[in-house]
C-alpha cells in the first residue's frame, strides 16, 4: 500500500487547514501533490501541497487522476465516508 497515491485520504498537518481531511487528486512530482477537501465538505480548498505537510490515513477511494470536486464528492458518498471526512483530527506533530 503506497502512502501517497491518488484517492488516498490524508490529514493536513500544517497551515490554517491543519487537522482537516483531504484527498489526493493528482501527484505533481516527488514533493508535491494536488489535494481537495472538497471545500464544500471539509473546508479544504483544491491546492498544491508539500507531502511533508500530509499524514496519510489507511482509507482511500477510487477516483480518476485530476478528478473534479463533484466526482470526489460522489465517490465519498458511494463509499459512505461523508461523516468520516467532516470530523476534524488533531494531527500528530512530527519534525520535518
Swiss-Prot record:
Keyword Cytoplasm belongs to the record: no
Keyword match Ribosomal protein: yes
Superkingdom in the source lineage: Archaea
GO biological process: ribosomal large subunit biogenesis; translation
A GO term from the CC aspect: cytosolic large ribosomal subunit
CDD domains reported for this sequence: KOW_RPL14
Pfam families the record matches: KOW (PF00467)
SUPFAM superfamilies: Translation proteins SH3-like domain (SSF50104)
GO molecular function: RNA binding; structural constituent of ribosome
The protein's name in its UniProt record: Large ribosomal subunit protein eL14
Native species: Desulfurococcus amylolyticus (strain DSM 18924 / JCM 16383 / VKM B-2413 / 1221n)
Gene that encodes it: rpl14e
Amino acid at each position: 500500500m503506497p502512502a501517497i497515491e491518488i484517492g488516498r485520504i490524508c490529514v493536513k498537518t500544517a497551515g490554517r487547514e491543519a487537522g482537516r481531511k483531504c484527498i489526493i487528486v493528482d501527484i505533481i512530482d516527488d514533493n508535491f501533490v494536488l489535494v481537495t477537501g472538497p471545500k464544500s465538505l471539509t473546508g479544504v480548498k483544491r491546492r498544491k501541497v508539500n507531502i511533508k505537510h500530509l499524514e496519510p490515513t489507511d482509507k482511500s477511494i477510487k477516483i480518476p487522476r485530476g478528478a473534479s470536486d463533484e466526482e470526489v464528492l460522489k465517490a465519498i458518498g458511494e463509499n459512505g465516508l461523508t461523516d468520516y471526512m467532516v470530523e476534524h483530527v488533531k494531527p500528530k506533530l512530527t519534525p520535518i
